[in-house]
Amino acid sequence: MFSMTKERAESLIQSITTSLSTATNRSDYQRWRSQDSFSKDWDSRSSIIASLVPPDSAVIEFGAGRMALKDLLPRGCSYTPSDLVDRGGGTLVCDLNRKMLPPIPRHDVAVFGGVLEYVHDVPRLISHLSNSVEIIVASYAVTDFNQENRRGNGWVNDLSSSDILALFEAAGFRMDCEDHWGTQSIYRFRRQLQHRPECRSR
């Protein structure tokens, strides 16, 4: 008799949803509308990301969710949340998968914590941001370490670490720091950086 665990069933449903999303280049509003979709376990990733943000920076966080990053930022930082839906607190509502991306107000730093996996055209997004920010701090579950069940997780793209570095470089950004959160990589990119200073990784 065929049986399926709840976890496996949920993964299968998510895989189907992701496949449909990929076919239409749309965001999964149903999933991300609810705050229940944002795990508190992700706060430790936000803490690492915050450590890569320079003090006194104007920061915009895409996929802000519970906005845990806001209280983790270094001294003097201002914070603008952005997400698919209005989370309050001055949220810039923005769907990163829309055909026409909106103008992004100037900020020093853009943050993507567990977001790029859900973007259908990552190169287009980074290119769009290239004149709006000086630094991008982004996590990504690279295929080097995360090959299994990507669609079951809702991820719509499959990029290796070298893919990530190449697409950011094509948009005029150079990596100057890399850290890790579990099997995910966390990168800091600076626009038109000529030299790569030392960075202490965890």
Predicted regions and their residues:
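A short SAM/SAH-binding and catalytic strip from SAM-dependent methyltransferases
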Residues: 108-121
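Conserved beta-strand signature within the Rossmann-like core of class I S-adenosyl-L-methionine
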Residues: 133-146
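Acceptor-substrate binding/catalytic loop of class I
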Residues: 146-163
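A SAM-dependent methyltransferase catalytic signature shared across enzymes that methylate proteins
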Residues: 162-178
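Conserved N-terminal segment of class I S-adenosyl-L-methionine
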Residues: 1-105, 193, 198-201
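Core SAM-dependent methyltransferase catalytic element
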Residues: 177-202
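Short catalytic/ligand-binding loop motif for oxyanion handling, primarily in non-cytosolic enzymes
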Residues: 68-71, 88, 119, 144-148, ...
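A short, conserved alpha-helix within the catalytic core of class I
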Residues: 119-132
